[in-house]
């Protein structure tokens, strides 16, 4: 499930809020001009589906969004666990690419067709860490300081929308804030714990 945590953006970040409620997540993100919505998952797509199959499965929604927002290029970024000898090296390099805080000269729009990844949005002395899951669409406005973590074992497929071929190039801020906020894997463990049902307290003795 989609999971949002809010942290202070100081030397010792503190957790201010956590939620899995889609309406609350959308409201928190809307307050910082970040678009968040859910698309129905396309039936029949197998695990590890090819890019062309993902694009075909969501073609009507992709075309509608592209026409409305002026996107000229759409592709699929995907990485899944593999038995290849160099997979961990490839995964680590892919993860490191946007793991530090940066901005873009264009909006960053991603639709997760499979798997998950965490966008960290640093706005107004807060960091909103939103773990996007399959079916989530997120649009980060240009100029927003943020970073993205796919975890130590990436497993996701995301449709990317661009208004220009070079719009995804990152301008890094030099801040080390990304090292102070829990990463993808720490948040995954935290959300799993939060989702566990709590045992009922024993009845008080009469």
Curated annotation (Swiss-Prot):
InterPro entries: ARD (IPR004313), ARD_bac (IPR023956), RmlC-like_jellyroll (IPR014710), RmlC_Cupin_sf (IPR011051)
Ranges in coiled-coil conformation: none
Gene3D superfamilies in the cross-refs: Jelly Rolls
UniProt cofactor note: Binds 1 Fe(2+) cation per monomer. Binds 1 nickel ion per monomer.
The UniProt record lists the keyword Protein transport: no
Site (May play a role in transmitting local conformational changes): 107
Residues annotated for Fe(2+) binding in this entry: 102, 104, 108, 146
A GO molecular-function annotation: iron ion binding
Residues noted as binding Ni(2+) in the record, renumbered to the chain: 102, 104, 108, 146
Family: Belongs to the acireductone dioxygenase (ARD) family.
Name assigned to this protein: Acireductone dioxygenase
